[in-house]
Amino acid sequence: MGMFVNPDNSAFQVALNSEIYVDKSGLIKYTNKVLNTLQGYICNSRPRRFGKSVTANMLTAYYSRGCNSEAMFADLEISKSTDFKKHLNQYDVIHLDIQWCMEPAGGSEQVVPYISERTIAELKEYYPDALPVETKSLPEALSQINALTGKKFIIIIDEWDVLIRDEASNAKAQEDYINFLRGMFKGTEPTKYIQLAYLTGILPIKKEKTQSALNNFDEFTMLSPSRLAPYIGFTEEEVKSLAEEYDQDFEEVKRWYDGYLLRDHQVYNPRAVVSVMLRGEYKSYWSETASYDTVVPLINMNYDGLKTAIIEMLSGSEVKVNTATFKNDTINIKSKDDVLTYMIHLGYLGYNQKLKTAFVPNEEIRQELTTAVESKPWNELLKFQQDSENLLDSTLDMDGVAVAVQIEKIHNEYASSIQYNNENSLSSVLTIAYLSVMQYYFKPIRELPTGRGFADFVFIPKPEYKSDYPALIVELKWNQNVRTAVQQIKDKKYPSSILSYSGDILLVGINYDKSTKEHQCLIERYEKD
């Protein structure tokens, strides 16, 4: 049992000792399945606070022959698997935490020599006859051990990408590290000594000339999680169970911390869910572990369409994003799409794999992103926020004429790239125009199911503002009549679907006349029976 070679299971025991532990050992069924196969090279990337280290520690505790973990896993899902004991504590495991290695190594350029020297020294304790004194290369050492003994290794690397993210300008450190990884995992020789390779970090593997530097790895990311989706964050069913156990309002938890759409799973941020269960406070827990130092420079980059995209997403809209151009490093960001893709990997944005769109996933992230934007505000954002505030005030004053004028102004000045063609384009402008309501209202619900039809937008006030702000039901029309829009709300019995959310309700009808290129607006207060 060593620091890097065949560690014990104490790190995973800490997770099990915690008041809340959500069983993710089902992941081991997959890793057992791909042991000693070409699919046994896994890079599982996800944002901070999504349980990367807990997962790495779990795999180490299960596979390492430096400990006995049968009792530890006895009540977990993996214990029901037929091959549970077959692989339990049966392998030589090398577990590296690159973030931790930075300090004892004495700097980024010394990380590779430090890891190699320390790991080889520990390997010599297990295989003293297999390693010549002159062996300095870790890949060579593993190859020599395999040639003499036939032994294969499980390699687990936590925070694999820290040198890619944090040392972006240090070309030597990055080159040495990428070459180290190539030596460890790429080519025919590593297949002889690798039983399983599991890398976890925030970024997928760095691309070079559009190809992965380690293209033999299967990548599971926030863009394409594949079959590992249930093991990235907490699933909806897991959160429902916790909410019931801790007597928390599941719908409130969902508004605050849901929104990461991974394959067919709604995934929640684990750290935030655990915090709200233990503390009972609905707030942002993001800034306790994530720094603005990364995202503020990103959103202030001067790429065409970036700031408009940020405003649109803060307003509740989704924006198209081409994720293919991002090279999975921070030095080669060249466009709006690269920025948005990086923000998806960081967890500041969600991603719809089917629609290829990015969006702000939940209330927690909306608050954090708004704070990040306001920490170094753009002049155009400050002016836009004021215009949006004026629009909200006019809406609450039921001044339809002023609302129409302000929506037209916002379209012309901030969203002119959105060409009016139909009701969908009008709705895109509307979400941008009402950005200011995000302080007082939840993310607007698009096409809320109602009594006899659908409302285009429903703005529901947050509980703390319910007595001061009415719910807003907005019906959009194209080349029709605002009175028709308001009457349609009444005819379809829209308000019945939200009476439980709010006391007062305003009905807002908005029409755009293509021939006159003018907006019209009519606002009425809903009179309850």
Residue ranges and their predicted role:
Residues 183-191, 341-349, 431-436, 488-508:
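Metal-dependent nuclease catalytic cores in nucleic-acid-processing enzymes
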Residues 1-422, 441, 445:
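Phosphate-binding site recognition
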Residues 497, 503-529:
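Domain-level recognition of nuclease-like catalytic cores that cleave nucleotide substrates
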Residues 415-451, 455:
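Catalytic cores of nuclease domains that cleave nucleic-acid phosphodiester backbones
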